[in-house]
């Protein structure tokens, strides 16, 4: 109860079509560009990071490398290695600090990633308008309803289809400012001043001194277990709790690499409090709860339970009991477990892994066996001209130009009008080639046909001329070097900003009184 003011999020609720339309803008680009620190040297992004298959080991090797300072970023999480110290930094109110201008910049970036091979933008004027104007207005600084009250909520609502990339942008802004300040220590007053410069709140969740020494100590201290001798563990191997997206590191003597285990707090909470079947559409199946138990207990062992003897034994026994129950009732075990990835909240982490077998030393070794990095998702030489134009638009603020939508609408218009011109030309050629079938037809009918042909040809010519003129104007506007000067919103002081849950333009010290009046909770004034 003492932390609900800082932990509560504005969960964004909207009709399904709204979620779908924003997803249609973000997902095609994000899903086809899983480039991250694991497959591109020097890339700080942890997007699509998987700790298994040697993923966490590559991060540990990155930490052990002597070069520093250095940083990684994932949504509202920032990780910095500075002075042999590991810092895990979290945006305290990442969603609340997001502005519409932030989301417009993110949408501008997404739209300008989507180009066809011949250089046409893969969106039209409608999508550009929705992405740049409508979506940010719906998601950021929107209003919520409590009974018959309409209350302003600041920042973006958590749970929208652009939450990740918006938070990723905010974290990147923090890192950019950190680089401009010549990378001060995260626990210094200079680093903390970034909050006031950007209006973005953050806090250091965890710091580990002598991070390289602690990681190296894991090697000689590894205890016999599934991945160190191929036996059931009798004693836990030590871990370093990096808080790397919830993962800690331990060492495997058999594989000779660092392997992931879920942070203790998360692991034991997950063991104590089951979430239930992940895919709610499966809940009506008879026997699904027992199948869920099999998957859940085996998954708990895979994500780190194998390292803790008591938890490992309990999960192993419970999974075995659930299997025997399904077999005794005559339920097709293989049919249930074929959908295991939709049963457990851990499903996405085990890509290409078959969980139908009980966890063994061999299966754990297979899950953690390193695989070569995926090549960058680039199938042809990158044309950096477009990237430079986008970068310039972001730096100068042209992407905020509501009249021109930073040229996105103009480009989309140019594309559609050029298509109109091509169609008009084709129609004119078609009309020009067409002739009456009967050369001896009545002269009146032939004159009517000729008049119709001339009228359509004239229309086609006007459409083509208009399209080319508009295309020329659009391209000139896009190539314009004029800088748009936006009206920046007043940057909120993090110390006196309204509470993001309630808002109402009230200082934070009065927010609890508003909550008490509306909700019967909190501290009265």
From Swiss-Prot:
Domain of life: Viruses
Domain (RdRp catalytic): residue spans on this chain: 72-272
Catalytic activity, as annotated: RNA(n) + a ribonucleoside 5'-triphosphate = RNA(n+1) + diphosphate
Single annotated GO MF: GTP binding
This protein's record includes keyword Nucleotidyltransferase: yes
Cellular compartment(s): Virion
GO biological process, any: viral genome replication
EC code(s) of this entry: 2.7.7.48
First-tier enzyme category under EC: transferase
PTM comment text: May exist in multiple phosphorylated forms.
Entry-linked Gene3D superfamilies: 1.10.1740.80, 6.10.140.300, Infectious bursal virus vp1 polymerase domain
Cellular component aspect of the GO annotation: virion component
Record flagged with keyword DNA-binding: no
Entry keyword set: Covalent protein-RNA linkage, GTP-binding, Nucleotide-binding, Nucleotidyltransferase, Phosphoprotein, RNA-directed RNA polymerase, Transferase, Viral RNA replication, Virion
Pfam name, any one: Birna_RdRp_palm
Oligomeric form and interacting partners: Interacts with VP3 in the cytoplasm.
Protein's job: RNA-dependent RNA polymerase which is found both free and covalently attached to the genomic RNA. May also contain guanylyl and methyl transferase activities.
Name of this protein: RNA-directed RNA polymerase
Taxonomic path: Viruses, Riboviria, Orthornavirae, Birnaviridae, Avibirnavirus
Name of the gene: VP1
């Amino acid at each position: 109860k003492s932390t609900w003011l800082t932990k509560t999020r504005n969960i964004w609720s909207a009709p399904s079509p709204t979620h779908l339309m924003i997803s249609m803008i973000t997902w095609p680009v994000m899903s086809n560009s899983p480039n991250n620190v694991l497959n591109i040297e020097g890339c700080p992004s942890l997007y699509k990071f998987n700790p298994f298959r040697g993923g966490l080991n590559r991060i540990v090797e990155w930490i052990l490398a002597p070069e520093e300072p250095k940083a990684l970023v994932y949504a509202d999480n920032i990780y910095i290695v500075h002075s042999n110290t590991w810092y895990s930094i979290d945006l305290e109110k990442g969603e609340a600090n997001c502005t519409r201008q932030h989301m417009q910049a993110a949408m501008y970036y997404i739209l300008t990633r989507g180009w066809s091979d011949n250089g046409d933008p893969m969106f039209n004027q409608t999508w550009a308008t929705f992405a740049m104007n409508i979506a940010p207005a719906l998601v950021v600084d929107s209003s919520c309803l409590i009974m018959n009250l309409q209350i302003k909520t600041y920042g973006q609502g958590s749970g929208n289809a652009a939450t990740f990339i918006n938070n990723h942008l905010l974290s990147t802004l923090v890192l950019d400012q950190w680089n401009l300040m010549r990378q001060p220590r995260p626990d210094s007053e200079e680093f903390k001043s970034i909050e006031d410069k950007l209006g973005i709140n953050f806090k250091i969740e965890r710091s580990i001194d002598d991070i390289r020494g602690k990681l190296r100590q894991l090697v000689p201290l590894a205890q016999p277990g599934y991945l160190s001798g191929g036996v059931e563990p009798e004693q836990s191997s030590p871990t370093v709790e990096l808080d790397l997206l919830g993962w800690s590191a331990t060492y495997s003597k058999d594989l000779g690499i660092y392997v992931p285990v879920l942070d203790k707090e998360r692991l034991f909470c997950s063991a104590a409090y089951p979430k239930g079947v992940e895919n709610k559409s499966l809940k009506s199946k008879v026997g699904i709860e027992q199948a869920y138990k099999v998957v859940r207990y085996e998954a708990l062992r895979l994500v780190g339970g194998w390292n803790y003897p008591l938890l490992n034994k309990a999960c192993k026994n419970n999974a075995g009991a659930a299997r025997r129950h399904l077999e005794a009732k005559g339920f097709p075990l293989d049919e249930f477990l074929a959908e295991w990835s939709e049963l457990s909240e851990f499903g996405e982490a085990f890509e290409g892994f078959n969980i139908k077998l009980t966890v063994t030393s061999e299966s754990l070794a297979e899950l953690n066996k390193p695989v070569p990095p995926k090549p960058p998702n680039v199938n042809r030489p990158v044309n950096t001209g477009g990237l430079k134009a986008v970068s310039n638009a972001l730096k100068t603020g042209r992407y905020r130009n509501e009249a021109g939508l930073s040229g996105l609408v103009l480009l989309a218009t140019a594309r559609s009008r050029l298509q109109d011109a091509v169609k008009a030309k084709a129609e004119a050629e078609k009309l020009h080639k067409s002739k009456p079938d009967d050369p001896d037809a009545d002269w009146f009918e032939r004159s009517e046909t000729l008049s119709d042909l001339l009228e359509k040809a004239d229309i086609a010519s006007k459409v083509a001329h208009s399209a080319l003129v508009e295309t020329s104007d659009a391209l000139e506007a896009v190539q314009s070097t004029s800088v748009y000067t936006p009206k920046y919103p007043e940057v909120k002081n993090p110390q006196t900003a309204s509470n993001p849950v309630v808002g109402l333009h009230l200082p934070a010290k009065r927010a609890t009184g508003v909550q008490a009046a509306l909700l019967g909770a909190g501290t009265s004034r």
